[in-house]
Structures are given as C-alpha cells and as structure tokens.
C-alpha cells in the first residue's frame, strides 16, 4: 500500500498532555498554548476535558479556556466528555466536538473507570443521542490496544470489537491508543489489518506513546497500512503514569518532521510549532520533550 499524500494531526497536548501535570497551569497559559497551536496550522486541537475536578484537577478551567481562545475558522476545538454530565458541561461551553473513550482491556476498564467494557460503552448511548440532537460530532478512543499494564498483551480481535462498537454507535472516527507504549511496528501493522476488517481504514487513527522509543516506527508502520490520522502532543507533553519517568505521548514536532521528510502534507509550520512547544515547556520549567526541537535549539 502506498503512503498517504496528506495526514491530519490531532493535537492532544492541551488535554492529554497537561492533565497529568502536578503543578497548576493557569487558564491564560493554556489559552496562549491553544492559540499558538492554531497559528502553527493545526486543524484539530483537543483543548480540555469536562471531568470532575476531584479526579483531574488540571482540567478544572476547561470552560474558561474555551471562552477565551481565539477560534480560527476551519480549526476543530475538541474536548473529552467521558459521561453525560461532562457532555452537558461541554455543550454549555460551546464545544462542537467531543471525544469518548473505552478500553480494550477489561482489567484496565475496571481499574480506570470502575466498570466493564460493555458497561462503559452503554454509558455513551445518552451522549451519542444528545450529540446527534445538538449537532455535535463525537470521536472515539480505544486505550490499551497494544498492551495493558495489568493484562499484558491484548488480542487485536478484542480491540476490533471495541472499535466496531464505538463506530456503530456513531463515532465518526476511532483512535487506537498504545497507552503504555509497548507496541512495535509489526504488532501495529497486524492491529490495523485486523481492526480495518471491522472499521474502515479511513475512519481509524493512531495514538502512540514513546515509552519504549517505538512511537515513530509505529507511526510509519501505520502509514504503510493506509492510516492518515494521528494523535500527537506538543513538546511530547504527558508522561506515562504506568512507567514513572518514561516519556508518554509522541511529540507533534517530531511527527511533523517525519511527515515532511516523506513528502506528506500536513499544513503545519514546523518552526511555529517548535516555538509553541518551547513556550509551554518554559511555563512548566523543563526542557521540551521533542527531539527535533532540542536538536534545532542546539544548532
């Protein structure tokens, strides 16, 4: 299969990246980050999450962030809404696209959200119904697709079943997440071969963590399988809560550099992206997690 000519990147840094940060980050800093990402040419930015501040204190100001960002025409500003209450809060904040998530691992589902996979999927039914009524689009996430911290390996057929359910419920796209970063290029190709029998390839996305240094190889393997949508995080924000000190999300800057080298169009200005990553890294008081940004700044 030939490589896609164009790739769409889903920027998850402001949500998935910042949610695990221990230090408080101001609404103003979050707004500045989102605006910088819009200006760099990203077409989709996951801005925040409408969850209980008790569980994810870092996401407490998501409604304020949505109220203050400069919305660029043509850019989608999404939010995670894991339950109906979260969806209603997102709706009140003027959010036009939400994401829901399920796990491919029963043990992870029980430990993370305290219910079975089938129970978690059933919880999304009222969200999908309300989203349809209000003209809100819904994106689906499946976590632990290439390994689980509690169960170990996960069968691709299990991932396909969960992805199929999300797609059948009305998720226009389903992102497959290597939550603990143990996936390899071979396993990634097999995963998409199996899942694409249940969900069309053009409706699938890849979400890779770099915990074992495999994210770029897995993205390339996905491209070979015809996948043309990837989630990534500015400056590699977002560590891995299951491997202390290890890197988590793949850095958007590094993915753009890879795609540029392959002649694949993204519409993203790499220099502006690097600057946005350096800015939020300065706010956090640590170096960027992007290898490309580090190499550029050392020149």
Regions found by a protein language model. Name each.
Residues 1-299:
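Catalytic cores and adjacent flexible loops of soluble metabolic enzymes
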């Amino acid at each position: 299969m030939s490589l896609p000519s164009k790739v769409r990147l889903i920027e998850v840094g402001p949500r998935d990246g910042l949610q695990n940060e221990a230090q408080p980050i101001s609404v103003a800093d979050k707004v500045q980050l989102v605006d910088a990402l819009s200006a760099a040419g990203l077409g989709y930015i996951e801005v925040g999450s409408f969850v209980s501040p008790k569980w994810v204190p870092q996401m407490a100001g998501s409604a304020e962030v949505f109220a203050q960002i400069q919305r660029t025409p043509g850019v989608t500003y999404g939010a995670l809404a894991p339950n109906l209450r979260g969806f209603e809060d997102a709706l009140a904040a003027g959010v036009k696209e939400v994401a829901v998530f399920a796990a491919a691992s029963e043990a992870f589902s029980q430990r993370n959200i305290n219910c079975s996979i089938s129970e978690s999927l059933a919880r999304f039914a009222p969200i999908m119904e309300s989203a349809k009524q209000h003209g809100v689009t819904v994106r689906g996430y499946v976590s632990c697709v290439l390994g689980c911290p509690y169960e170990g390996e996960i069968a691709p057929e299990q991932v396909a079943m969960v992805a199929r359910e999300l797609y059948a419920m009305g998720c226009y796209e389903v992102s497959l997440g290597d939550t603990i970063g143990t996936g390899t290029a071979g396993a990634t190709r097999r995963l998409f071969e199996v899942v694409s029998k249940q969900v069309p390839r053009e409706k699938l996305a890849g979400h890779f963590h770099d915990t074992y240094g495999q994210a770029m190889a897995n993205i390339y393997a996905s491209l070979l399988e015809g996948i043309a949508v990837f989630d990534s995080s500015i400056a590699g924000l977002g560590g891995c809560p299951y491997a202390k000190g290890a890197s988590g999300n793949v850095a958007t800057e590094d993915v753009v550099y890879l795609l540029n080298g392959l002649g694949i169009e993204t519409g993203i200005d790499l220099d502006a992206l690097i600057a946005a990553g350096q800015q939020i890294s300065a706010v956090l008081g640590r170096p960027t997690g992007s290898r490309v940004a580090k190499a550029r700044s050392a020149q």
